[in-house]
């Protein structure tokens, strides 16, 4: 017999004019260290307005400043002050492989730290002397994860107090073992967005204001933006996100949109984007679902071999899902704690575990057949 066909469920397609156009911004296609050097050479040291997200009280800071003032009392230039502080840290702080508190004050008092503690203390001590510095986190080749600093004296320098390393930033060949992935300062800011360097990309860290439709910018200050992974909540009115051809990542380890965009119903990706694509409210990367808007009510999926456990969990708004032909199976608890989910359109040939839908609407039903868009 002919298979049932359901009509009236359409995948919304955004017009191409909705996306940010190529504004000629420069793509950061070099290695990570060269990209950071390019960005910092452009921004200058005025971007450093504090100590990042350092955990330190006013009393702790005051004590470190009083000590540092005495330590550098015979120094006259920023370079001399930096050298004295750097020498004191590399001489007096001992690397401790076990657990230690790496906030700057405990490091200052106990003289024990791992790399993060070294970088934190150098950052704070330089800050007490009005010398611009920031923390960098990334990789120490071939060892693994590492933290160090960028410092501005007469020029930008790369400072690795853990390993007694000091390099001019422009001399990239001298510190190829340091691969920066994240900086703890904002690089650019305008009326709508705040940008920083994260996960080796120029990223939009914050959306300051937007209407219902959020158009992700193509570039800023002449540099192409390649990531949109906010670390602060989007404005409440944002319901639609338009992701242009420039965006390659929404986050590697943690998608900020999954946390900070509770009211987004639709996410669209420019068809010219070679890394991401969108269909039926879902953003895909490498043919796998990557981001599902938290307020989407109808979600259509491209064919996926298997919907595994917790494929979609704790989605408060979805009411209808559509599974396409080519999907082999839905495992137990594939869709869990989706209290408004009432309908699932699933091809007849797709195997569905008896517990594939758990914690859904009391009137939930599976409709077998073909969905005509």
Can you describe what each PLM-predicted range is?
Residues 117-181:
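Hydrophobic/aromatic-rich core segments of domains that either
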Residues 151-154, 207, 285-286:
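Active-site beta-strand termini and strand-to-loop segments that position acidic
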Residues 192-199, 209-226, 234-249, 257-281, ...:
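Structural signature of tandem-repeat unit edges
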Residues 89, 135-140, 160-164, 219, ...:
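Active-site-proximal beta-strand/loop segments in catalytic clefts of secreted hydrolases
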Residues 81-85, 89, 111-126:
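Active-site nucleophilic cysteine motif
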Residues 1-31:
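Intrinsically disordered, low-complexity N-terminal segments that are enriched in acidic
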Residues 45-108:
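Secondary-structure boundary elements
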């Amino acid at each position: 017999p002919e298979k049932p066909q359901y009509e009236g469920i359409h995948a919304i397609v955004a017009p191409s004019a909705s996306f940010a156009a190529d504004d000629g911004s420069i793509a950061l296609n070099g290695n990570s260290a060269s990209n950071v050097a390019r960005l910092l050479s452009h921004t200058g040291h005025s971007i450093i307005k504090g100590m990042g997200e350092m955990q330190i009280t006013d009393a702790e800071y005051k004590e470190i400043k009083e000590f540092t003032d005495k330590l550098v009392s015979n120094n006259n230039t920023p370079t001399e002050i930096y050298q004295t502080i750097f020498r004191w840290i590399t001489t007096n702080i001992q690397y401790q492989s076990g657990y230690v508190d790496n906030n700057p004050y405990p490091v200052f008092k106990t003289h024990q730290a791992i790399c993060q503690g070294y970088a934190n203390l150098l950052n704070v001590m330089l800050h007490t002397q009005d010398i611009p510095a920031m923390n960098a986190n990334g990789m120490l080749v071939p060892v693994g994860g590492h933290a160090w600093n960028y410092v501005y004296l007469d020029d930008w320098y790369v400072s690795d107090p853990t390993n007694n390393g000091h390099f001019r930033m422009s001399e990239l060949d001298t510190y190829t073992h340091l691969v920066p992935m994240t900086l703890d300062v904002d690089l650019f800011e305008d009326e709508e967005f705040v940008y920083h360097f994260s996960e080796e990309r120029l990223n939009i860290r914050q959306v300051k204001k937007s209407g219902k439709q959020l158009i992700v910018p193509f570039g800023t200050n002449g540099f192409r933006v390649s990531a949109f992974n906010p670390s602060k909540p989007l404005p409440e009115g944002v319901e639609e996100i338009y992701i242009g051809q420039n965006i390659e990542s929404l986050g590697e380890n943690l998608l900020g949109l999954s946390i900070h965009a509770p009211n987004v119903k639709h996410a669209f990706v420019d068809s010219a984007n070679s890394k991401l694509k969108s269909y039926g409210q879902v953003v895909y990367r490498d043919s796998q679902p990557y981001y599902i808007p938290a307020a989407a009510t109808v979600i259509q999926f491209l064919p996926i071999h298997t919907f595994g456990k917790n494929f979609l969990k704790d989605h408060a708004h979805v009411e209808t899902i559509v599974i396409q032909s080519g999907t082999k199976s839905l495992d137990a608890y594939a869709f869990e704690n989706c209290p408004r989910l009432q309908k699932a359109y699933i091809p007849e040939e797709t195997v569905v575990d008896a517990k594939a839908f758990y914690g859904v609407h009391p009137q939930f039903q599976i409709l077998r057949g073909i969905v005509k868009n």
